[in-house]
Amino acid sequence: MSNLTLAQYLQQKNGNLTPELAQVIETIANSCKKIDHAIQKGALADLLGSAGNENVQGETQKKLDVLSNDFLIDALKVHPHVGGLASEELDEFTPGQQDGKYLVLFDPLDGSSNIDINMCVGTIFSILPAKNSITQTQDFMQAGTEQVAAGYVLYGPSTMMALTCGEGVAFFTFDPESQTFILTSDAIQLDADTQEFAINASNQRHWEEPVKRYIDELLAGKTSVRGKDFNMRWVACMVADIHRILCRSGIFMYPYDLKDPSKAGRLRLMYEANPMSFLIEQAGGSATTGRVRIMDIQPNDLHQRVPVIIGSKNEVDLVTSYH
């Protein structure tokens, strides 16, 4: 693997990757470097613990949630090619620049409940084409198939970015010495079959019958119709769980459950499900709600929630068929 920097990689890409889009991606990456630095400081900079507020999702915000959100908004709202941006942490979208070509949506710090115990967290982003010279909320209501780029940054033992611009998936590793993201894997592909699954099993009593059936079969292992044993993994950070799947295949599930029937699912379509679905599909996997392809959903709200079943194609197809 050549030691291409993220900037060099973007310069070499064709297709729908315009120079303007490359600049937006680099701006997101630079903001994530700041987030990474803040996470590394942690308690030394008094950045652990709650900020004392709730976000639009009704979740208690961590100090690093707020700081990460500010880093991204401050950089993107003044970017000449960003017409508007939307954050999981804020109720309304933030206007960008008139005639900006792109809209950016992001979850600034996924898995923030892991912060105080020094476990993995991440940033997720999605980029859509802008529809008008002056952005309105309705301009964000685009299906996931309209995404021109998506990715995440995982803040783990090493800091890594996964990126797709619609032509496969690449991994970049952050080099703290040069302060650059370096291409370390290209053409990431999932196996169609797997023996690993990720789900929060504490919600089992609330699941629909198709999901209960599927998980029961996995847990029965060799003694079931599956004829093989499975291992369960759960990090409580979607970025970390999806990164594992991109590295060694698997299936991730946050299905519809009856714990709160007013919610169609737990994960946010625009900030989590769509960008992760784009990555997984570009790596040869599948992503559905259990009933429909996630990227075909027409959004009706910036903070719309959906069930998510995503990963190795044959497993996703099987559990979807049970619905």
From Swiss-Prot:
EC annotation from Swiss-Prot or TrEMBL: 3.1.3.11
The keyword Cytoplasm belongs to this UniProt entry's keyword annotation: yes
Bridged cysteine pairs (disulfide): none
CDD domains xref list: FBPase
BP GO terms, sorted: fructose 1,6-bisphosphate metabolic process; fructose 6-phosphate metabolic process; fructose metabolic process; gluconeogenesis; sucrose biosynthetic process
Record-linked InterPro entries: FBPase_C_dom (IPR044015), FBPase_class-1 (IPR000146), FBPase_N (IPR033391), FBPtase (IPR028343)
Catalyses which reaction(s): beta-D-fructose 1,6-bisphosphate + H2O = beta-D-fructose 6-phosphate + phosphate
Keywords from the named record: Carbohydrate metabolism, Cytoplasm, Hydrolase, Magnesium, Metal-binding
Keyword Hydrolase: yes
Binding-site residues, substrate: D110, G111, S112, S113, N200
Binding locations of Mg(2+) 2: D107, D110, E272
Enzyme's top EC category: hydrolase
Coiled coil: none
Cofactor section: Mg(2+)
Recorded GO CC terms: cytosol
Any one GO MF annotation of this record: fructose 1,6-bisphosphate 1-phosphatase activity
Entry's localization field: Cytoplasm
Residues the record lists as binding Mg(2+) 1: E88, D107, L109
Cofactor binding remark: Binds 2 magnesium ions per subunit.
Pathway entry: Carbohydrate biosynthesis; gluconeogenesis
Subunit: Homotetramer.
Record-stated family: Belongs to the FBPase class 1 family.
Annotated HAMAP family: FBPase_class1
Name of this protein: Fructose-1,6-bisphosphatase class 1
Organism this protein belongs to: Acinetobacter baylyi (strain ATCC 33305 / BD413 / ADP1)
Gene that specifies this protein: fbp
